[in-house]
Amino acid sequence: MIEADRLIHPQIIDREEAEAVDRAMRPKMLDEYTGQDDTRAQLKIFIEAAQKRGEALDHMLIYGPPGLGKTTLAMIVANEMGVNIKSTSGPVLEKAGDLAALLTNLEPNDVLFIDEIHRLSPVVEEILYPAMEDYQLDIMIGEGPAARSIKLDLPPFTLVGATTRAGALTSPLRARFGIPLRLEFYNVKDLSSIVARSAKVMALEIDDEGAVEIARRSRGTPRIANRLLRRVRDFAEVKHSGDVTKVIAEAALDMLDVDAEGFDYMDRKLLLAIIDKFMGGPVGLDNLAAAIGEERETIEDVLEPFLIQQGFIQRTPRGRIATPRAYNHFNIIKPDA
């Protein structure tokens, strides 16, 4: 697994960090939400239409790399609809009764948010199908020959599922989501706006160039941008006057070993393994995972997406290949084929 202290890990490092983001930095309404313009425009229409009809919003699947705002969007949906949200995650729902307890406590049009929905157990998933389609819950009462099935009516509700691995969902579950939304990595302009907004919430003075520098090294991910902003603030308060400029942001992030592309030692280790150990590739995922001491799922879900999106790695049928841009990043001359 990825080391817990990896600063640019796009997943939540600890629950305290998540709660701090929840309280202060997360936008509450769509108008406050920055980036993902197409997704935001679609959601605005879907929400307004559901409100006009007085109905629950259709079930929604939000997918994409970690740290892009899937949980935030689920909360915004509940706020925009003026309803409550109950949150859980796939691994937590071990038994059918766990899901039944949540569903039977929903009010009309409430939002049920299930993070990591691709990790639902088959038993729980089977219970979810009639709940999503017919707002009914099929549960078994008793055991053995005396066991019987009863149907409970549920109020209309919106299931919002979030996943980093949409392909891991079963086809029957995926087909029951009427609104699929894919979140993309953020551009520097949108990320710098997020950094500036977060700095304002933190009562931190930051100039435009400082915000851009943090955004540029945040791997297109708001969660990483906010995490780096907090560490840059620490540096600015101890080493300087407390205000953040480009020079201060550069010094702080260099000290934290986050380079100009947003890479840390794990990214560099991955790229250099392909270049040095496997002569630029192609290399299979299992061999690459063994070479850098990581799990293949970590490489696929956390390390690779940004490197591929930025053009440092290519996936081919034969394996991963380091691109010319990867060689240039390390000032290595690519040997002739």
UniProtKB/Swiss-Prot annotation:
Family the entry assigns: Belongs to the RuvB family.
Chain's role: The RuvA-RuvB-RuvC complex processes Holliday junction (HJ) DNA during genetic recombination and DNA repair, while the RuvA-RuvB complex plays an important role in the rescue of blocked DNA replication forks via replication fork reversal (RFR). RuvA specifically binds to HJ cruciform DNA, conferring on it an open structure. The RuvB hexamer acts as an ATP-dependent pump, pulling dsDNA into and through the RuvAB complex. RuvB forms 2 homohexamers on either side of HJ DNA bound by 1 or 2 RuvA tetramers; 4 subunits per hexamer contact DNA at a time.
Catalytic activity: ATP + H2O = ADP + phosphate + H(+)
Species per Swiss-Prot/TrEMBL record: Shewanella halifaxensis (strain HAW-EB4)
Keyword Nucleotide-binding: yes
Subunit structure comment from the entry: Homohexamer. Forms an RuvA(8)-RuvB(12)-Holliday junction (HJ) complex. HJ DNA is sandwiched between 2 RuvA tetramers; dsDNA enters through RuvA and exits via RuvB. An RuvB hexamer assembles on each DNA strand where it exits the tetramer. Each RuvB hexamer is contacted by two RuvA subunits (via domain III) on 2 adjacent RuvB subunits; this complex drives branch migration. In the full resolvosome a probable DNA-RuvA(4)-RuvB(12)-RuvC(2) complex forms which resolves the HJ.
Record flagged with keyword Transferase: no
Name by which UniProt lists this protein: Holliday junction branch migration complex subunit RuvB
